[in-house]
Every structure is written in C-alpha cells, then in structure tokens.
Amino acid sequence: MPKNSHFSQKILTWFEISGRHDLPWQQHKKEQSDIYAVWLSEIMLQQTQVSTVIPYFQRFIAKFPTVIDLAAADWDEVANLWAGLGYYARAKNLHQGAKQVVDFIKHTGNFPQSVDQWQTIKGVGQSTAGAIVAMGVRGFGVICDGNVKRVLSRWAMISDDINKTATQKQLWQLAQALTPKHDSGKYAQAMMDLGATICTKNRPKCTLCPISADCQAYQKANPINYPVKNKS
C-alpha cells in the first residue's frame, strides 16, 4: 500500500489545472449549490457517458427546473424526456424519488442533508448519496463509484477480485481514508474526472496522472490488469 500523504492535494491540484470545469451540473464554482441538479446528474451518469448525458440533463432542467416540478409531472412526460438514455428504471426511481424529496422538504424545510437520509430516497445508493452530500449539500461525503474503484484498485494494486464483498469493503475504507474533510465536493468531482479522462479502463494515460509516482500498478505491474475480476 502506497503512502496516503498528499494524495488528495495532488488530485485537487490536477483538477484545478487539467480537470473539466464546464459540465452543466458542476457546482464547485457556484456560491450556492443546486442539490437537485447534482442528484439529477448523478442518476443520469450511472453507466452512461458524460457526452450522452449533457443534452438530456439540459432538457430535463429546462422542463423540470425544480424537484417540485419533477414530482408534479406525469410519468409519461418524464419517460418521453428520458427516451434514448436507457436503463429506464433510473427514470422511474428518479420520479418516485422526487416525490419523496418533496415530502421530505414539506416536513423539514430542506432537502435531505446526510448520506443516511439520501439513501432512503428511491434509487440512491451509498456512492450516489455521498456524491450528493459532497457536491450538493457541501458536507462530508465519500464516493466510491466505478471510476473511483478503478483509480484506487490501481493505486493500491489491490489483487483480490473486485466483486468480492471483502474487496468492496476495502475499497470503501480506502476511499473514506483518502477523502479530505474539507473540499470533499471538489475532491469527488476530481476523482470522477480522473477516472473518466485519465485512469480509463483500456488506455490509461498514466504519464499524465497526478498520482502515477505512487501508483503501485503503474510502478510494478500493468494498470490494465486492475481492478482484478476473476472469472467465475
């Protein structure tokens, strides 16, 4: 296991200089974040490329600018706007989740504020909840999606099957240990960006990676072989 020192700072510095800052859902440059926009984008980005999501996100925000608008919409309206994006269960969960969030706001006066609260919303898992809290609520949230797992598996050269429960637990523990208490929102965006643009699945750009000097898979092996997925 490489040393953790300055890991997050290297990631944040890279993001500031080389990361993407023009995605329509990004909140790190805004004075007040839009929790709804973060949630919507996180659901749309599940298993879907950024370039595909952008026009769908923009159409959704134009049609349903607030969570109240989305909750009040007919399912047919939502389904029509989602058409072509795939994984339609996400759209159903999003629509049902919007109704839950509106109900939560009615009772508390605000959006869910914690990871635990967000995980009660339909279709929101642990990593999505962490992303929403970190980037939308601007609290402390940990993400460990596919991009992050790939980065960490290579950096720490985790040789166990990524599909094993113990490996998943190890990755989550590592993600939590490396996430800075402050700026976890910008760090979350940076980690997802690093995985999507540099530490890619098939052709990682290791020479451009800010953590390549500490990356065990890059220094000792072939990053392409990580994360490990054993054939059953």
Language model: regions and residue ranges:
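Intrinsically disordered, low-complexity boundary segments flanking structured domains
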Residues: 10-11, 178-179, 230-231
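Residues lining hydrophobic/aromatic ligand-binding pockets adjacent to catalytic sites
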Residues: 1
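Short cysteine/histidine-rich metal-coordination sites, predominantly Zn2+-binding motifs
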Residues: 222-232
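Thiotemplate assembly-line natural product biosynthesis machinery
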Residues: 6-17
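Catalytic cores of DNA base-excision repair glycosylases
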Residues: 16-205, 211-220, 224
